[in-house]
UniProtKB/Swiss-Prot annotation:
Residues the record marks as carrying a glycan: N64, N73, N220, N233, N269, N304, N328, N373, N391, N408, N456, N509, N527, N542
Signal peptide as annotated in the record: 1-21
PANTHER family, sorted: LEUCINE RICH REPEAT FAMILY PROTEIN, EXPRESSED, PROTEIN KINASE DOMAIN-CONTAINING PROTEIN
Protein name as it appears in the record: LRR receptor-like serine/threonine-protein kinase ER2
Active site: D779
Domain Protein kinase: 653-934
Length: 986
């Protein structure tokens, strides 16, 4: 009887659960109503909500017995709208994952009614408001992940009432107030992530009550006070990150009792000495004490840290010599001692650090020669000894550093000649020997450094000529040879350097004219003042950018820029011949005499020390020397990688992994441990003006997710090179497909081109209209439109653009962009707004329509199309691949119209990108989705992953498809701007 009763009760419970589950289908449909952008991602969420149906809907996992919703995973679908309060009706759901969408509004209080919930992940959205107190009702909750939103208010102290909470990640929000002390009494909490908020108050002595906590991160807040003396009791900590707060006092002695792998205290106001006991923390892999006010010597006992890979002590007030014992740190990869007050010699023992990637000794008071032993650091990528008192010569043995990309020995007292062996350092992208006493000629072999981006030999005693071999520096962006004794002409070969942005030759003895530079279209900074140049200063091409100050001190130069006429009457010419001849003979004799005297005195005056301090810039103006080389992961598909992993996988960014070059970066391909490929962009700029602002911008960009934008997965900033990690897209750039050689060039039919145009427009429209703050791309071009395996367009390189200010326009100090795509209004005024991007996009449309480059053999595609439009012959320019595959050439004509509208000369006459999307959307007619083969969002499993696997597997994704617009709005757009296909739109 008892067994029968029990069975009946069990069956009754199951029937009740099944009956309750019948409501889950209707609940899901109610949740869908609050979402936007659902048409192409939740297309199967339809019908009457019967159990057997909704359990097969995308992202829905049901219990095998009751058919109740057990898990809901809609991550990475770019869903907009809000979270419906109806979500509280999912009584049996154990996991809700809505991360990496565009959800806004507040977290509904009804979330507290999901009483079975174990994992709640709403990260990487735009959710605002307070964290609801109702979450404290979720007694089974193990993982609460709300990072990267816009949440405000205080952290609810009621979160301490969650007895099973193991992961609490509230990073990258706008939370304020203090960290609730009651949280520290949660016995099972293992992960506490609070970085990048506005938290105040002090570190509680009770923080070590968390006996299971291994990850404690409060980086980038406004915490004050001292590190509590009880810190030594936090024996379970593996990662302790207190960086970028306002903490003061000395580093407590008992911090040495910790067995952490990462100890990061940088960017605070700690003072006093470095505790010697830190040398006993054998588990340390990363020790970062940089950018504080620490004083005294570097403890020699730090040499005992044989497992430490990164040692950052820069930006303090450390004195004394560099301990030779640091050479015993056998696994060290990064040694940053710059911006201190260190004295003495560079220890030869540092040569034992054969695994070292980065050695930064800049801005100290080090003396003596550079030891030859440094060349034993075979894996060294960056060596910076700028701003010391080093003497002797540049070691010839440095050429053994085959992996080095960055060499800066500037602002010292180095003498002798430039070793020709430096030309063997084939991976160099930066070579800076400026502000020394280096003498003799420039070795012509330097011209063989094909990856060189920046060359600075200024403020030395160099003689001879500028080598014509510099014309082989195809990647070079900056050349500074100013303040030397160079003579001869500016080589014609230098005028062929298409990537050259800066050329400084002032204060030399250079002769001839400047006409050879007229074809350096990218040249933005030119200074040839105080030489012996003569002739006419051009006024066209790039020379329109330069002020008269660029040409001062050259009496023989003339022209419009200098306010002096290059032509005089024949009478004046004849009357001055005799006087000129006499004067010329006298001057020539004097010059010959001076040359003889100079040759006799050369060995003596070549060694006269210069005042190095005159060319030593303010260290605060060069934050790059203060950049700790850290790897920051923004999305978890790269989680638990370290910088060394990436260096190892790419063999220290070997050239064999290069897949492309850009105006601002070299691009490498790296296959991660999980076999997922990523693209690594190594930026040419080493010195962001504001490191913290730059990092904040990168983190913001990393949170931007859209189907048609290339996602920033992470970044690393260091003097060795700033690296950005992006999604890798299989089919390269649109430029490759349209213009590359036979190996990459593909035939694109009309439908594919339309979809590429629409995808790029959707990505750009999202930046202009849906980001907060809005973003101007600044360099829209076919090389920045990448194509995935299905040839869907993804807009790249939007990440480094400055966010729009609250004003309507943004004034840039220099013209950005690529020749052929630059808005003429922007080029003339440097005033930048969204319409500058619209112009560039219009040029991309012309590329798609014609298959031709924007500029080719001095032929400008835009001008050519305008002339054809004026003659009503524009259709002659259509790419043959379009003519063969397009069923309605009227569509082609409409896109020509749109391209010319986008590239109108007056910005106010151009459409917005939202309007462009509407027009293209009406031309693209995708088949209605029937039953596309889409993978389920969650594995069909009856169990929910453990909290560790759940958190490790966090990853971004996006599959947004924009809403369609009515044809009426498209017709209104064409009516608004008028027919332009037969008009000259200039």
């Amino acid at each position: 009887m008892t067994t029968t009763t029990t069975t009946r009760l069990l069956l009754a419970a199951i029937l009740l659960a099944v009956a309750a589950a019948d409501d889950d289908g209707q609940t899901l449909l109610e949740i869908k109503k609050s979402f936007r952008n659902v048409d192409n991602v939740l297309y199967d969420w339809a019908g009457d909500g019967a159990p057997r149906r909704y359990c097969s809907w995308r992202g829905v996992l049901c219990d095998n017995v009751t058919f109740a919703v057990a898990a809901l995973n809609l991550s990475g679908l770019n869903l907009g709208g809000e979270i419906s309060p109806a979500i509280g009706n999912l009584k049996s759901v154990e996991s809700i994952d809505l991360k990496s969408n565009e959800l806004s509004g507040q977290i509904p209080d009804e979330i507290g009614d999901c009483t079975s919930l174990k994992t709640l992940d709403l990260s990487s959205n735009n959710l605002g408001g307070d964290i609801p107190f109702s979450i404290s009702k979720l007694k089974h909750l193990e993982n609460l992940i709300l990072k990267n939103n816009q949440l405000v208010g205080m952290i609810p102290s009621t979160l301490s009432q969650l007895p099973n909470l193991k992961i609490l990640d509230l990073a990258q929000n706008k939370l304020n107030g203090e960290i609730p002390r009651l949280i520290y009494w949660n016995e099972v909490l293992q992960y506490l992530g609070l970085r990048s908020n506005n938290l105040e108050g002090s570190l509680s002595p009770e923080m070590c009550q968390l006996t299971g906590l291994w990850y404690f991160d409060v980086k980038n807040n406004s915490l004050t006070g001292i590190i509590p003396d009880t810190i030594g009791n936090c024996t379970s900590f593996q990662v302790l990150d207190l960086s970028y707060n306002r903490l003061t006092g000395e580093i407590p002695f008992n911090i040495g009792f910790l067995q952490v792998a990462t100890l990061s205290l940088q960017g605070n106001n700690f003072s006093g000495p470095i505790p010697s006991v830190i040398g006993l923390m054998q588990a340390l892999a990363v020790l970062d004490l940089s950018f504080n006010q620490l004083s005294g010597p570097i403890p020699s006992i730090l040499g005992n840290l044989t497992y430490t890979e990164k040692l950052y002590l820069q930006g303090n007030r450390l004195t004394g010599s560099i301990p030779p014992e640091l050479g015993n740190m056998s696994t060290l990869h990064y040694l940053e001692l710059n911006d201190n007050q260190l004295t003495g010699f560079i220890p030869p023992e540092l040569g034992k650090l054969t695994g070292l990637f980065d050695l930064n000794l800049a801005n100290n008071n080090l003396e003596g020669p550079i030891p030859d032993n440094i060349s034993s650091c075979m894996n060294l990528i960056s060596f910076n000894a700028y701003g010391n008192k080093l003497n002797g010569t540049v070691p010839r043995s440095l050429h053994k550093l085959e992996s080095i990309t960055y060499l800066n020995l500037s602002s010292n007292y180095l003498s002798g000649a430039i070793p020709i062996e430096l030309a063997k350092m084939k991976n160099l992208d930066t070579l800076d020997l400026s502000c020394n006493m280096v003498a003799g000629p420039i070795p012509s072999a330097i011209g063989s450094l094909e990856h060189l981006l920046r060359l600075n030999f200024s403020n030395n005693n160099l003689v001879g000529y500028i080598p014509a071999e510099f014309g082989n520096l195809r990647s070079i962006m900056e050349i500074d040879l100013s303040s030397n004794h160079l003579g001869g002409l500016i080589p014609q070969e230098v005028g062929m350097l298409q990537n050259l942005i800066l050329l400084k030759l002032e204060s030399n003895n250079i002769t001839g004219d400047v006409s050879s530079l007229i074809n350096c279209f990218s040249l933005n900074v030119l200074n040839v003042s105080y030489n012996n140049l003569a002739g006419i200063v051009p006024t066209d091409n790039n020379f329109s950018r330069f002020s008269p100050d660029s040409f001062l001190g050259n009496p023989g130069l003339c022209g419009y820029w200098l306010g002096s006429s290059c032509y005089s009457t024949s009478h004046v010419q004849r009357s001055s011949v005799s006087r000129s001849a006499i004067l010329g003979i006298a001057v020539a004799g004097l010059v010959i005499l001076l040359m003889i005297l100079a040759a006799a005195c050369w060995p003596h005056w070549a060694q006269v020390p210069k005042d190095v301090s005159l060319c030593k810039p303010d260290i605060h103006a060069l934050p790059s020397s203060n950049v700790p080389p850290k790897l920051v992961i923004l999305h978890m598909n790269m989680a638990f990688l370290v910088y060394e992993d990436i260096m190892r996988m790419t063999e220290n960014l070997s050239e064999k992994y290069i897949i492309g070059y850009g105006a601002s970066s070299t691009v490498y391909k790296c296959v991660l441990k999980n076999c997922k490929p990523v693209a690594i962009k190594k930026l040419y700029a080493h010195y962001p003006q504001s490191l913290k602002e730059f990092e904040t911008e990168l983190e913001t960009v990393g949170s931007i997710k859209h189907r048609n934008l290339v996602s920033l997965q992470g970044y690393s900033l260091s003097p060795a090179g700033n690296l950005l990690f992006y999604d890798y897209l299989e089919n390269g750039s649109l430029w490759d497909v349209l213009h590359a050689g036979s190996s990459k060039k593909q035939k694109l039919d009309w439908e594919a081109r339309l979809r590429i145009a629409l995808g790029a427009a959707q990505g750009l429209a999202y930046l202009h209209h849906d980001c907060n703050p809005r973003i101007i791309h600044r360099d829209v071009k076919s090389k920045n439109i990448l194509l995935d395996k299905d040839y869907e367009a993804h807009l790249a390189d939007f990440g480094i653009a400055k966010s729009l200010c609250t004003s309507k326009t943004h004034t840039s100090t220099y013209v950005m962009g690529t020749i052929g795509y630059i808005d003429p209004e922007y080029a003339c005024t440097s005033r930048l707004n969204e319409k500058s991007d619209v112009y560039s996009y219009g040029i991309v449309l012309l590329e798609l329509l014609t298959g031709k480059k924007p500029v080719d053999n001095e032929c400008n595609l835009h001008h050519l199309i305008l002339s054809k439009a004026a003659d009503n012959t524009v259709m002659e320019m259509v790419d043959p691949d379009i003519a063969d595959t397009c069923k309605d050439l009227g569509e082609v004509k409409k896109v020509f119209q749109l391209a010319l509208l986008c590239s109108k000369r007056q910005p106010s006459d151009r459409p917005t990108m939202h309007e462009v999307v509407r027009v293209l959307d009406c031309l693209v007619y995708p088949d209605p989705p029937s039953k596309p083969a889409l993978p389920p969002a969650l594995p069909q499993s009856s169990t929910v992953p453990s909290y560790v696997n759940e958190y490790v597997s966090l990853r971004g994704g996006s599959t947004l498809s924009c809403e369609n617009s009515s044809s009426a709005s498209d017709a209104e757009l064409f009516l608004k701007f008028g027919e332009v296909i037969s008009q000259n739109t200039e």
